[in-house]
Design a protein with these regions (language model features):
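Short, Lys/Arg-rich, polar N-terminal cytosolic tail immediately upstream
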Residues: 1-13
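Membrane-helix interface linkers and caps
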Residues: 2-5, 77-100, 232
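Functionally critical transmembrane alpha-helices in membrane proteins and complexes, commonly lining
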Residues: 12-82
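Aromatic-enriched alpha-helical transmembrane segments of multi-pass intramembrane proteins
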Residues: 15, 21-24, 138-235
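Hydrophobic residues within membrane-embedded alpha-helical segments of Major Facilitator Superfamily
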Residues: 24, 68-70, 76, 109, ...
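Transmembrane helix-loop junctions in multipass membrane proteins, especially transporters and channels
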Residues: 37, 41, 83-85, 119-128, ...
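Membrane-interface helix-loop-helix regions
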Residues: 47-58, 89, 93-95, 104-169, ...
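Transmembrane alpha-helical segments in integral membrane proteins
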Residues: 67-83, 122, 169-179
Length: 235
Protein backbone atom coordinates (compact mmCIF):
# COMPACT_ATOMS: atom_id res chain seq x y z
CA UNK A 1 0.00 0.00 0.00
CA UNK A 2 1.39 3.42 -0.99
CA UNK A 3 1.15 6.17 1.65
CA UNK A 4 0.07 9.73 1.06
CA UNK A 5 2.65 11.85 -0.75
CA UNK A 6 4.54 14.15 1.59
CA UNK A 7 6.77 17.13 0.88
CA UNK A 8 9.80 16.70 3.12
CA UNK A 9 11.51 19.98 3.89
CA UNK A 10 12.22 22.94 1.62
CA UNK A 11 11.77 22.24 -2.09
CA UNK A 12 13.89 24.41 -4.37
CA UNK A 13 11.92 23.29 -7.43
CA UNK A 14 8.55 24.20 -5.94
CA UNK A 15 9.80 27.54 -4.66
CA UNK A 16 11.29 28.23 -8.09
CA UNK A 17 7.93 27.43 -9.69
CA UNK A 18 6.22 29.83 -7.29
CA UNK A 19 8.83 32.43 -8.20
CA UNK A 20 8.15 31.96 -11.92
CA UNK A 21 4.42 32.36 -11.29
CA UNK A 22 5.04 35.55 -9.29
CA UNK A 23 7.30 36.86 -12.07
CA UNK A 24 4.58 36.18 -14.67
CA UNK A 25 2.14 38.17 -12.54
CA UNK A 26 4.57 41.10 -12.29
CA UNK A 27 5.42 41.12 -16.01
CA UNK A 28 1.76 40.60 -16.90
CA UNK A 29 0.82 43.69 -14.93
CA UNK A 30 3.46 45.64 -16.82
CA UNK A 31 1.56 44.81 -20.02
CA UNK A 32 -1.65 46.22 -18.50
CA UNK A 33 -0.01 49.67 -18.55
CA UNK A 34 -0.06 49.86 -22.37
CA UNK A 35 -3.16 50.09 -24.54
CA UNK A 36 -1.84 48.05 -27.46
CA UNK A 37 -2.17 44.30 -27.21
CA UNK A 38 -4.92 44.15 -24.59
CA UNK A 39 -6.35 40.75 -25.49
CA UNK A 40 -9.01 40.98 -22.75
CA UNK A 41 -10.57 43.94 -24.56
CA UNK A 42 -13.79 42.94 -26.32
CA UNK A 43 -12.77 45.13 -29.27
CA UNK A 44 -9.26 43.72 -29.55
CA UNK A 45 -8.01 43.22 -33.11
CA UNK A 46 -4.69 41.53 -33.81
CA UNK A 47 -2.47 43.75 -35.97
CA UNK A 48 1.25 43.82 -36.81
CA UNK A 49 1.63 46.79 -34.48
CA UNK A 50 0.30 44.99 -31.40
CA UNK A 51 1.19 41.37 -32.18
CA UNK A 52 4.37 41.36 -30.07
CA UNK A 53 2.60 42.83 -27.04
CA UNK A 54 -0.28 40.38 -27.42
CA UNK A 55 2.15 37.46 -27.63
CA UNK A 56 3.93 38.71 -24.52
CA UNK A 57 0.66 38.97 -22.64
CA UNK A 58 -0.18 35.38 -23.55
CA UNK A 59 3.28 34.18 -22.50
CA UNK A 60 3.17 36.06 -19.18
CA UNK A 61 -0.51 35.50 -18.44
CA UNK A 62 -1.03 37.01 -14.96
CA UNK A 63 -4.49 35.54 -14.33
CA UNK A 64 -3.33 31.97 -14.92
CA UNK A 65 -0.14 32.61 -12.95
CA UNK A 66 -2.13 33.82 -9.92
CA UNK A 67 -4.16 30.58 -9.89
CA UNK A 68 -0.99 28.48 -10.18
CA UNK A 69 0.65 30.48 -7.39
CA UNK A 70 -2.33 29.98 -5.07
CA UNK A 71 -2.47 26.23 -5.73
CA UNK A 72 1.25 25.93 -4.99
CA UNK A 73 0.79 28.06 -1.86
CA UNK A 74 -1.95 25.75 -0.63
CA UNK A 75 0.31 22.77 -1.29
CA UNK A 76 3.50 24.15 0.28
CA UNK A 77 1.79 25.76 3.27
CA UNK A 78 -0.44 22.76 3.87
CA UNK A 79 2.61 20.50 3.98
CA UNK A 80 4.36 22.97 6.27
CA UNK A 81 1.41 22.77 8.66
CA UNK A 82 1.55 18.96 8.69
CA UNK A 83 5.34 18.77 8.99
CA UNK A 84 6.17 21.26 11.73
CA UNK A 85 5.79 20.05 15.30
CA UNK A 86 4.63 22.11 18.30
CA UNK A 87 3.80 21.38 21.97
CA UNK A 88 0.09 21.83 21.27
CA UNK A 89 -2.31 22.76 18.49
CA UNK A 90 -2.69 26.36 19.60
CA UNK A 91 1.08 26.91 19.59
CA UNK A 92 1.29 25.17 16.22
CA UNK A 93 -1.31 27.42 14.59
CA UNK A 94 0.06 30.51 16.31
CA UNK A 95 3.56 29.84 14.99
CA UNK A 96 2.15 29.28 11.50
CA UNK A 97 0.30 32.61 11.65
CA UNK A 98 3.36 34.50 12.87
CA UNK A 99 5.54 33.03 10.10
CA UNK A 100 3.03 33.99 7.43
CA UNK A 101 2.54 37.52 8.77
CA UNK A 102 6.31 37.99 8.94
CA UNK A 103 6.61 37.02 5.27
CA UNK A 104 3.65 39.04 3.99
CA UNK A 105 3.30 42.24 6.02
CA UNK A 106 6.72 43.93 5.60
CA UNK A 107 6.59 43.66 1.80
CA UNK A 108 2.92 44.71 1.75
CA UNK A 109 3.61 47.76 3.93
CA UNK A 110 6.59 48.80 1.80
CA UNK A 111 4.47 48.49 -1.35
CA UNK A 112 1.66 50.58 0.15
CA UNK A 113 4.02 53.34 1.31
CA UNK A 114 5.70 53.45 -2.10
CA UNK A 115 2.34 53.54 -3.91
CA UNK A 116 1.09 56.29 -1.57
CA UNK A 117 4.19 58.38 -2.29
CA UNK A 118 3.72 57.92 -6.04
CA UNK A 119 0.03 58.85 -5.75
CA UNK A 120 0.91 62.08 -3.93
CA UNK A 121 3.83 63.04 -6.18
CA UNK A 122 2.01 62.26 -9.45
CA UNK A 123 -1.40 63.61 -8.45
CA UNK A 124 -3.54 64.20 -11.59
CA UNK A 125 -0.61 63.44 -13.90
CA UNK A 126 -1.40 62.09 -17.37
CA UNK A 127 0.65 59.79 -19.58
CA UNK A 128 0.14 59.18 -23.29
CA UNK A 129 -0.69 55.65 -24.42
CA UNK A 130 -1.56 54.24 -21.00
CA UNK A 131 -4.68 52.33 -19.95
CA UNK A 132 -7.41 53.49 -17.59
CA UNK A 133 -6.18 50.85 -15.12
CA UNK A 134 -2.82 52.62 -14.94
CA UNK A 135 -4.27 56.14 -15.05
CA UNK A 136 -6.37 55.54 -11.94
CA UNK A 137 -3.19 55.46 -9.83
CA UNK A 138 -2.80 59.23 -10.34
CA UNK A 139 -6.17 59.89 -8.69
CA UNK A 140 -5.88 57.56 -5.69
CA UNK A 141 -7.13 59.13 -2.46
CA UNK A 142 -4.52 59.17 0.30
CA UNK A 143 -5.21 60.24 3.89
CA UNK A 144 -4.04 59.00 7.30
CA UNK A 145 -7.28 57.02 7.75
CA UNK A 146 -7.07 55.46 4.28
CA UNK A 147 -3.38 54.69 4.76
CA UNK A 148 -4.07 52.96 8.08
CA UNK A 149 -6.91 50.94 6.53
CA UNK A 150 -4.57 49.74 3.78
CA UNK A 151 -1.72 48.95 6.17
CA UNK A 152 -4.09 46.80 8.23
CA UNK A 153 -5.04 44.85 5.09
CA UNK A 154 -8.67 46.00 5.21
CA UNK A 155 -8.46 47.77 1.85
CA UNK A 156 -6.27 47.80 -1.25
CA UNK A 157 -7.40 51.20 -2.53
CA UNK A 158 -3.89 52.71 -2.58
CA UNK A 159 -2.29 49.82 -4.49
CA UNK A 160 -5.03 47.81 -6.17
CA UNK A 161 -2.80 44.84 -7.03
CA UNK A 162 -2.56 44.00 -3.32
CA UNK A 163 -5.96 42.30 -3.48
CA UNK A 164 -3.95 39.10 -3.91
CA UNK A 165 -2.09 39.69 -0.63
CA UNK A 166 -5.42 40.25 1.12
CA UNK A 167 -6.38 36.73 0.06
CA UNK A 168 -3.12 35.35 1.45
CA UNK A 169 -3.83 37.08 4.77
CA UNK A 170 -7.31 35.55 5.03
CA UNK A 171 -5.87 32.14 4.17
CA UNK A 172 -3.72 32.28 7.31
CA UNK A 173 -6.99 31.48 9.09
CA UNK A 174 -8.72 29.34 6.46
CA UNK A 175 -5.86 27.15 5.21
CA UNK A 176 -5.41 25.24 8.50
CA UNK A 177 -9.13 24.41 8.34
CA UNK A 178 -8.75 23.21 4.75
CA UNK A 179 -5.73 21.06 5.62
CA UNK A 180 -7.59 19.61 8.63
CA UNK A 181 -10.66 18.80 6.51
CA UNK A 182 -8.67 17.30 3.65
CA UNK A 183 -6.78 15.06 6.09
CA UNK A 184 -10.10 13.57 7.23
CA UNK A 185 -11.86 13.11 3.90
CA UNK A 186 -11.48 10.80 0.94
CA UNK A 187 -10.14 11.68 -2.48
CA UNK A 188 -13.59 11.84 -4.05
CA UNK A 189 -14.88 14.27 -1.44
CA UNK A 190 -11.83 16.45 -2.00
CA UNK A 191 -12.70 16.51 -5.70
CA UNK A 192 -16.28 17.46 -4.89
CA UNK A 193 -15.10 20.24 -2.58
CA UNK A 194 -12.75 21.69 -5.20
CA UNK A 195 -15.45 21.45 -7.88
CA UNK A 196 -18.09 23.07 -5.66
CA UNK A 197 -15.78 25.93 -4.70
CA UNK A 198 -14.81 26.43 -8.35
CA UNK A 199 -18.40 26.47 -9.60
CA UNK A 200 -19.32 28.81 -6.76
CA UNK A 201 -16.54 31.17 -7.84
CA UNK A 202 -17.92 31.25 -11.40
CA UNK A 203 -21.50 31.75 -10.24
CA UNK A 204 -20.76 34.49 -7.71
CA UNK A 205 -17.85 36.23 -9.42
CA UNK A 206 -17.86 39.91 -8.49
CA UNK A 207 -20.45 39.34 -5.76
CA UNK A 208 -18.57 37.64 -2.91
CA UNK A 209 -15.15 38.61 -1.48
CA UNK A 210 -12.06 37.64 -3.46
CA UNK A 211 -10.87 35.09 -0.90
CA UNK A 212 -14.08 33.10 -1.50
CA UNK A 213 -13.53 33.18 -5.27
CA UNK A 214 -10.01 31.74 -5.00
CA UNK A 215 -10.62 29.34 -2.10
CA UNK A 216 -10.74 26.41 -4.55
CA UNK A 217 -7.07 27.02 -5.44
CA UNK A 218 -5.91 26.71 -1.85
CA UNK A 219 -8.09 23.69 -1.13
CA UNK A 220 -6.78 21.97 -4.26
CA UNK A 221 -3.25 22.71 -3.09
CA UNK A 222 -3.93 21.36 0.40
CA UNK A 223 -5.43 18.17 -1.08
CA UNK A 224 -2.76 17.82 -3.78
CA UNK A 225 -0.68 15.24 -1.83
CA UNK A 226 -3.60 12.79 -2.02
CA UNK A 227 -4.10 13.40 -5.73
CA UNK A 228 -0.37 12.85 -6.33
CA UNK A 229 -0.43 9.66 -4.27
CA UNK A 230 -3.38 8.37 -6.27
CA UNK A 231 -1.55 9.15 -9.52
CA UNK A 232 1.51 7.19 -8.33
CA UNK A 233 -0.69 4.20 -7.41
CA UNK A 234 -2.34 4.34 -10.85
CA UNK A 235 1.07 3.92 -12.47
Amino acid sequence: MVGVFRLEGHSVRLQSLRGIAALCVAVGHAFTVMRNGRIEDAHFTLRPGNALLAAGELLFQPNTAVILFYVLSGFVLGESLRRRAAPNERSHLGAFGVRRLWRLLPVMWLSILFAAAVAVLLRDATFAGTTSWFDQFSSVAVSPAILLENLLGLSHSINSVLWSIQIELVMIVLLPLMAWLSARTGLWLDGVMVGALYLGAIEFWGVVPNFVLFAYCFYLGAALPKFLSNAMVAR
